[in-house]
Amino acid sequence: MSVRITEVEAYLGPHDSPHPDPGSHTFRGATARNAPMFGPAGHLYVYFTYGLHHCANIVCGPAGVASAVLLRAGEIVAGEELALSRRPASKSPKDLASGPARLATSLGITTADSGRDALEAPFGLELPAMQAVDVSAGPRVGVSGAGGTHDYPWRFWLSGDPTVSRYKAAKVRTP
């Protein structure tokens, strides 16, 4: 299976780091769950959310420094049949990997893959030769508090791509 990533979100470190990120799972420090996000680069950080979905991140910083990009959306370019078998409720090919949980499900990524090297089998990352495309930036999807504001325009997507997920602001929580 091959996927062209069309949307990501960046997440950085704990409150006491040089780059504190209130929207990050690492903001309150290292835990057993978020340990893979502290490196090394090129490894997966996978978490289970809402008791339903897996979401996959690729760690970006050196060992000991929390940073990762959440893989938010992609286009299945090879292996559509396998993706459909994993996501039979998909309404169209562009829907197969539009959103972080759909993308992880299409790829068959689970928390069992957290900490694995994304550059080694069965995974693989490559930067194919292609023309430059327009990239848009804005606030992250569904992140509450300061980390979900325009002060953190760390969501990046290929402008106009039909597989990019819809923007949804976080719901305001009342105490």
Locate the predicted segments by residue.
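Conserved, well-structured core segments that form or line functional sites
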Residues: 1-175
